[in-house]
UniProtKB/Swiss-Prot annotation:
Substrate binds at S238, Q260, H263, H329, D362, E416, H421. Zn(2+) binds at Q260, H263, D362, H421. The gene is hisD2. GO terms for cellular component: cytosol. Binds 1 zinc ion per subunit. NAD(+) binds at Y130, Q192, N215. Catalyzes the sequential NAD-dependent oxidations of L-histidinol to L-histidinaldehyde and then to L-histidine. Its cofactor is Zn(2+). This is Histidinol dehydrogenase 2. It is an enzyme of class 1 (oxidoreductase). Keywords: Amino-acid biosynthesis, Histidine biosynthesis, Metal-binding, NAD, Oxidoreductase, Zinc.
Length: 433
């Protein structure tokens, strides 16, 4: 059952326990397995990818079957309803519109003495998107990862996703990928997919940036290949924290908590409220909705282990506790969310008001749903167009400008014991004289 505790209890310790839920001893064993997979794929390429696809996904493939064919992509449209296709297209438009507003612009400043300074943004050459399989068809993951890459101007976007029964990929995932400009799709999942994207194989291209969520093996693989390639983040299990007052609908709050818990047995769903009656009513509503929940086993585990209701003294106290937890998703189900918002410093995405469930942001509001988890919102942000961009500094000095700063550069280079640095300026000054 969903627990209710008061602020006087050791709330911070309980929140820390939930935040640290992925830091168990088994991770070390899993990391050793992942290292083995990475090295095998790096050395053996397709052969290792096919071996691990058989071992972990129970699908026997040939190298030529790794890439999804054009006929499969065409057939996927026949298997998707008109309603779903229209929903994908609506979500795509809104996500793209939001991300186009956030594209950083290159700039150049012309200063005194013909000094030119600036910053130039350019996309990576190749982006690799990972889309999980397993519990659901993650259509929204395709959109949220591919669209920022497309908006950034990445010329080659490839996707990896694990094969299901009979080597099939969910048709909705294939349709979504085509709608947003993914050029290549490979049926490979897990750590072997991350390795293939990071190192390249005979069939799968090496990319520059890998994005997308996955299980602990995928996350560890991304951690270990970072440096060889860029990554978006190290995402843990999903989480929602809801701050609610007496005006919130307990059935809605309960549903929002279950919407998070149904993701994964390790997902976290937390409620902070000032109203004891709401706390009790949410507890009851959660139990009622669990009875016939289609994903009851996993959802019930998440609620039992990582679900929590905390009675707080005030909304200010709730905001401060929320900042310490730094949730991936934060819902402000209060009468005046804009009054609470200034007190929120750390959250991946913030949903304001009684009519803004997290699902709006998950699917089609526009902001990205790939968010920092496990407290990382203290220092990290959502996936964005900038994930797929680099920026280069632009610097040009005239001879006049160089003459004016030569002494300062000489002093700094001499202090650091780097004589050739100083000479590189001195000789240009002497040449000018």
């Amino acid at each position: 059952m969903l627990r209710i505790i008061t602020q006087q209890a050791d709330v911070k310790a309980e929140l820390q326990r939930i935040c640290d839920r992925t830091h168990d001893e088994q991770v070390l064993h899993k990391e050793a397995t992942v290292r083995e997979v990475l090295q095998a794929v790096k050395r053996q390429g397709d052969k290792a990818v096919l071996h691990y696809t058989d071992e972990f996904d129970n699908q026997i493939l040939k190298a030529e079957e790794l890439r999804v064919t054009g006929s499969e992509l065409d057939a996927a449209y026949q298997q998707v309803s008109k309603e779903l296709l229209e929903a994908i297209q609506l979500a795509s438009r809104q996500i793209e519109a939001f991300h186009r507003q956030r594209v950083p612009k290159s700039w150049v400043h012309f200063g005194d003495d013909d000094i030119v300074l600036g910053k130039r943004y350019t996309p990576v050459d190749r982006a690799g998107l990972y889309v999980p399989g397993g519990r659901a068809a993650y259509v929204s993951t395709v959109l949220m990862n591919a669209i920022p890459a497309k908006v950034a101007g990445v010329p080659r976007i490839v996707m990896a996703t694990p094969p299901g029964a009979q080597k099939a990929i969910n048709p909705a995932v294939l349709v979504a990928a085509q709608e947003v400009g993914v050029q290549e799709i490979y049926r490979v999942g897990g750590a072997q997919a991350i390795a293939a994207l990071a190192y390249g194989t005979e069939t799968i291209p090496k990319v520059d940036v890998i994005t997308g969520p996955g299980n602990i093996y995928v996350t560890l693989a991304k951690k270990l290949v970072y440096g060889t390639v860029g990554i978006d983040s190290l995402a843990g299990p999903s989480e929602v924290l809801i701050i609610a007052d007496e005006g919130a609908n307990p059935v809605h709050v309960a549903t929002d908590m279950l919407a998070q818990a149904e993701h994964d047995p390790m997902a976290a769903a937390i409620l902070f409220t000032t109203d004891p009656a709401l706390a009790k009513n949410v507890q009851v509503a959660v139990e009622r909705q669990l009875v016939d929940h289609p994903r009851r086993i996993d959802t019930e585990k998440a609620i039992a282990h990582y679900g929590l209701i905390v009675l707080v003294e005030s909304l200010d106290a709730a905001a401060e506790l929320s900042n310490e937890f730094a949730p991936e998703h934060l819902e402000l189900e209060v009468k005046d969310p804009w009054a609470v918002l200034p007190n929120i410093r750390h959250a991946g995405a913030i949903f304001l008001g009684y009519s803004t469930p997290e699902a709006v942001g998950d699917y089609l509001a526009g902001p990205n749903h790939t968010l920092p988890t496990s407290g990382a919102a203290r220092y990290a942000s959502a996936l964005s167009v900038e994930t797929f961009l680099k920026h280069s500094s632009i610097i040009q000095y005239s001879q006049t400008a160089l003459n004016k700063v030569a002494g300062a550069i000489d002093a700094l280079a001499t202090a650091e014991g780097l004589p050739s640095h100083a000479d590189s300026v001195k000789r240009r000054i002497q040449q000018d004289e």
